[in-house]
Amino acid sequence: MSETKTHDEAVAKIATMIKDTRIAMLTSVTENGDLHSRPMATLDVEFDGDLWFFTGKHSPKVHQIEEKPRVNVAFSDPENQTYVSLSGTASLVSDSAKNKELWNPALQAWFPQGLDDPELSLLKIHVDGAEYWDAPSSAVSHVVGFVQAKLTGKSGDPGDHAKVEL
């Protein structure tokens, strides 16, 4: 595990790791206590400790979150060997100014009436915990790690891994 990071360092590290990931998996708890995950389109906004997603006001996830607001959001970038798991508290936000700030025309696939769509709402996740893995991603790194492990009997550099409270 890596060295302890300050709050600002942890937020900056996570922001860098999730910046280009276009789809995240949002996991909520159903009324039966089961975990339910679904893909969510990420928004082009700098991570500052909060995550934002557009959602339909009457989608099943909204009901689940109103009942049990603790959620997990997972980001995966296998090409770069980066993985992030964020936990926090979700809430539904109705804010037309924030909608306008975060809106992207590609979202019309889900909200045909655009910013005027009556179903349009924001889901805000206030992140309070994170765990991430940032491994060397090049083929050369993997070969060097393999050779190092064979020669020394010790595993190669697993990269950066940390659990942080935000």
Regions found by a protein language model. Name each.
Residues G33-M40:
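A positional/architectural concept
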Residues Q64-V127:
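Short, structured beta-strand-loop surface elements
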Residues D48-W52:
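Short active-site oxyanion
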